[in-house]
């Protein structure tokens, strides 16, 4: 299964390298990783380019146009900017935040779930945060809600729901559209 990962990034120089390394160290490797730099003023682009020289699966796309400043719109606009760069062979489209550290079996687990459940259109995961030296579950949303920070879509599902909506609540709208 070919995973195409799009990572919107803005001033993520301190975290994007760790995020990319956690994806490149997976037991099941991604087919393509696109980092869309949304006009960062730090060294985000340089960090990504340095990694991309060692790993051809990583590609930097720079977005200089300014999108609408509506709640929830900017992240989706930046993600959408990366969509045309996905290769045709991508079977699962992933939208991941730029400040995540993935367990080394994350993509393998995701692949297994998609393979075992042909009707599965979306898959996500839990987010943990470091608090006082320990990793604890971030309880911002209901456990059956797929967090916007870490979402994947079977390509057919993504196309059927018409992609991500440029609006506040995009990460709930996609789930509702996929269910109904």
Task: Annotate each language-model stretch with its function.
Residues 101-137:
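Conserved donor NDP-sugar-binding/catalytic core segment of glycosyltransferases
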Residues 1-25:
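N-proximal low-complexity "stem/linker" segments adjacent to membrane-targeting elements
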């Amino acid at each position: 299964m070919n995973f195409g990962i799009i990572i919107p990034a803005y001033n993520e120089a301190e975290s994007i390298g760790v995020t990319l390394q956690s994806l490149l160290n997976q037991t099941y490797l991604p087919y393509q990783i696109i980092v869309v730099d949304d006009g960062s003023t730090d060294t985000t682009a340089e960090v990504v380019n340095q990694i991309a020289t060692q790993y051809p699966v990583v590609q930097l796309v720079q977005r200089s146009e300014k999108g609408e400043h509506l709640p929830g719109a900017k992240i989706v606009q930046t993600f959408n900017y990366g969509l045309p760069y996905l290769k045709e062979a991508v079977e699962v489209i992933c939208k991941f935040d730029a400040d995540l550290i993935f367990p080394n079996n994350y993509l393998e687990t995701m692949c297994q779930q998609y393979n075992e459940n042909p009707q599965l259109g979306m898959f996500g995961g839990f987010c943990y945060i470091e608090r006082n030296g320990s990793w604890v579950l971030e309880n911002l949303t209901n456990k059956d809600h797929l967090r916007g920070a870490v979402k994947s879509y079977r390509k057919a599902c993504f196309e059927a729901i018409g992609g991500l909506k440029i609006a506040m609540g995009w990460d709930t709208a996609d789930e509702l559209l996929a269910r109904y």
